[in-house]
Design a protein with these regions (language model features):
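Small beta-barrel nucleic-acid-binding modules, primarily SNase/OB-fold domains
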Residues: 1-130
Length: 130
């Protein structure tokens, strides 16, 4: 696992493929809940056979996909349990699940005002430029 929304899988022909989970954005590793999100994803799927449903490529040409373990949408699981945001800029698939996690104060929603990863990245980028 690279982080809570990116995985590396061994595909046919023993080729390692990096996949960005479609429709979600997990906290960055150095953010609050970043390591928890990564560890949750890892404990859920590491070493298991998953079903990958490609959805396209992102602006960085990374493969995007929904991943399933025994018919469970893992992307949805991460959002619904408060380990990731619904990435509504690119997909509306998981809005209901984010609202559920917020209402029940699950995972990162235990924090009064969690910082979305896109704001964290933007602030980090600004800081590097100066």
């Amino acid at each position: 696992m690279s982080d809570g929304d990116t995985i590396k899988v061994l595909a046919d022909g023993n080729k390692v493929v990096k996949i960005r989970l479609h429709g979600i954005d997990a906290p960055e590793k150095k953010q609050a809940f970043g390591r928890v999100a990564k560890n949750t994803l890892s404990s859920k799927i590491a070493g298991k056979i998953i079903n990958i449903v490609p959805t396209g490529k992102d602006r960085y040409k990374r493969e995007l996909a929904k991943i399933y373990l025994d018919n469970e949408d893992i992307n949805r699981y991460l959002v619904r349990n408060g380990y990731a945001w619904a990435f509504v800029k690119y997909s509306k698939d998981y809005i209901f699940d984010e609202n559920y996690a917020r209402a029940h104060k699950l995972g990162l929603w235990q924090d009064i005002s969690p910082t979305p990863p896109w704001d964290f990245r933007k602030a980090k980028k600004k800081h590097k430029i100066k």
